[in-house]
């Protein structure tokens, strides 16, 4: 039997983590998360962090020498060229980590949580694409509350990604997270039991 590799994506603050946590806890599936790999890529002493500090100066670092992620986020979500430069350093590292995880896993089903799955052309790593969506107003509200952002900051982050409509059009499975948690988890169970 071929390995199922689910690419779990969606817009920022749509519920990807909720779905991933459920797949791990209720279905005992291995979860590999791009955000964790991206944090590893810029860990203290990493060549990528050094390159970022050289480009933006020491003010991009916290007193302990680690990356000031909110400050970098503010800079790159306002400037597409800066965002692309940072992503060009981080994404190859993340891709390599996914390839290693896939090669080493013996599980029949893997879940790769990749917020920018479509945007950074990592769809070739997966056998199916699951997109978590919700209404635009819910997404904005959730993001502002979760990340303590202003409306303008939240909108800039949302605008840096493909729209939910564009992601849903490419998806094999669309999970609608605009109503209850129970409704979302039922959709996950159905999608998991349905082989493409």
From Swiss-Prot:
Its main location: cytoplasm. This is Dephospho-CoA kinase. It comes from Nostoc sp. (strain PCC 7120 / SAG 25.82 / UTEX 2576). It is found in: Cytoplasm. NCBIfam families: dephospho-CoA kinase. It catalyses: 3'-dephospho-CoA + ATP = ADP + CoA + H(+). PROSITE patterns: DPCK. PANTHER family: BIFUNCTIONAL COENZYME A SYNTHASE-RELATED (PTHR10695:SF46), DEPHOSPHO-COA KINASE-RELATED (PTHR10695). One of its GO terms (cellular component) is cytoplasm. The keyword Cytoplasm applies. HAMAP family: Dephospho_CoA_kinase.
């Amino acid at each position: 039997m071929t390995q199922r590799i689910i690419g779990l994506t969606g817009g920022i603050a749509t519920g990807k983590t909720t779905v991933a946590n459920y797949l791990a806890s209720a279905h005992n599936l291995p979860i590999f998360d791009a955000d964790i790999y991206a944090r590893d890529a810029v860990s203290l002493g990493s060549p990528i962090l050094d390159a970022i500090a050289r480009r933006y100066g020491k003010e991009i670092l916290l007193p302990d020498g680690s990356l000031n992620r909110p400050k970098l986020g503010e800079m790159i979500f306002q400037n597409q060229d800066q965002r692309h430069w940072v992503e060009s350093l981080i994404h190859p590292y993340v891709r390599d980590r996914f390839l290693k995880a896939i090669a080493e896993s013996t599980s029949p089903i893997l879940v790769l949580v990749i917020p920018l799955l479509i945007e950074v052309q990592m769809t070739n790593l997966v056998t199916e694409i699951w997109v978590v969506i919700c209404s635009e107003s819910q997404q904005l509200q959730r993001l502002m509350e979760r990340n303590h952002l202003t409306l303008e900051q939240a909108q800039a982050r949302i605008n840096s990604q493909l729209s939910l409509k564009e992601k849903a059009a490419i998806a094999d499975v669309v999970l609608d997270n605009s109503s209850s948690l129970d409704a979302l988890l039922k959709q996950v169970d159905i999608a998991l039991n349905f082989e493409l």
